[in-house]
Amino acid sequence: RLGLEIGMHNSPGFSVTGGPWIDPAHAMQKVVWTKRAVPGGAVLKGAALERPWACLGHYRDIAVLAVPDGAAVAAGDILDLTSRVRDGALDWRAPAGRNWTVYRFGHTPTGQRTHPVPDEIRKTCLETDKLSREATELHIREGLEPLRKRLGRHWGRTFTHITVDS
C-alpha cells in the first residue's frame, strides 16, 4: 500500500551465521591432526593412531599421510596411507632408510556460536559451515523456508531481500 520494501539478515546474529537447527556435523569446521614418529623399516600391525581432538563430540577423518623426515620433502615422497587404516588402526611397513612422521588429519566443529543473538538462544545456535552445500541447504530449509511460509504473499513483494554475507 505504501510501496515499502524490507529485508533482513538470513538468521539471528550476523549474516549466514546459523541457528538452533545447525548440529555439530553442519557447523563451521576446522582441520585438526595428530602425528606419530615411525622409524624406517618399522612394521606397524594394528597400530593405534591417536584421534585428533573433537569439539562437541564430532570428528571425521580426512586422510592419513606419511611424510619422510627431512628439511625439504618432495610432494611425490609423501605417502597416502588412508586406505591402510581401519577404525583408527594402521597396518603399514615403513620404507627403510629414513624415518617417517605419520599424520592423521580430520575435521571437527570450531564451536563458534552465532552472535549477536538473544541470550535465550545463544547456547543453542552454532554457526553454519559456509563451505558445505549440505549445511547451506539445511540452513535455508530450516531457517528461511518457515519465514517464507509465514510471510505468504508479502514474500518477494514487500519483503524483497535477504542479506547473505559470508
What do these predicted regions represent?
Residues 1-166:
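Mature extracytoplasmic enzyme cores
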